[in-house]
Amino acid sequence: QEVDLDWAYEVARGHSPTGRVMLERFLPGPQVSTESLVIEGNAYTPGFADRNYEYLERYAPHIIENGGQLPSHLNVTTQQAVRDLVQKAASSMGIRNGVVKGDIVLADGQPYVIELAARLSGGYFCTHEIPLNTGVDLVGAAIRQALGESIDTKELLPKWNRPVAQRYLFPSLGVVRAVEGADR
């Protein structure tokens, strides 16, 4: 999609306290969110969700995610390539123990890091979606690891693979005049 770079530069610069601007290239392709626990340098990634961007055209040039779903539609080989990239990226950040949240795009069949952060995800991904999808209590394991307890890596292995989907709603402007059926 074409974007007026002069306009984008001025808008970004107007919000920059230093007047500096960073330009990134948009890589088209499916995106996934990952959630990992790193134990002694090894990343265990029970959280793996396809991200949903059905409103890219509506909100352009802004990129608004409107949910995700598990299990991923990606094949096992591609999922492993994503896990390997998360492992490599976490290692390059020096993370030997702790949590890693990753957002990855697959462009031309190759995974690329959009974001990698030493934190848990928000938006119910780590607290609700991963446990519902896999039976893995990643938040509990992360808390126990932070308290210095050892984690049995078997508890990070999925117990099942149940479908889970979440969508964010962006309703049109208006006024709610009534709510019917709330008593049922």
Tell me what each language-model feature is.
Residues R25, P71-N75, P131, L156:
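Alpha-helix initiation/capping motif
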Residues Q1, S36, L169-S172:
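Short beta-strand-to-loop capping motifs
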Residues E2, Q31, V76-R83, L132, ...:
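Electropositive phosphate-/nucleotide-binding environments in soluble metabolic enzymes
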Residues A12-R20, L27-P71, Q80-K101, V105-Y112, ...:
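Phosphate-binding core of ATP-grasp and ATP-grasp-like enzymes
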Residues A141-R184:
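Peripheral (often C-terminal) accessory segments that flank ATP-dependent C-N-forming ligase machineries
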Residues R119-A141:
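ATP-dependent carboxylate-activation loops
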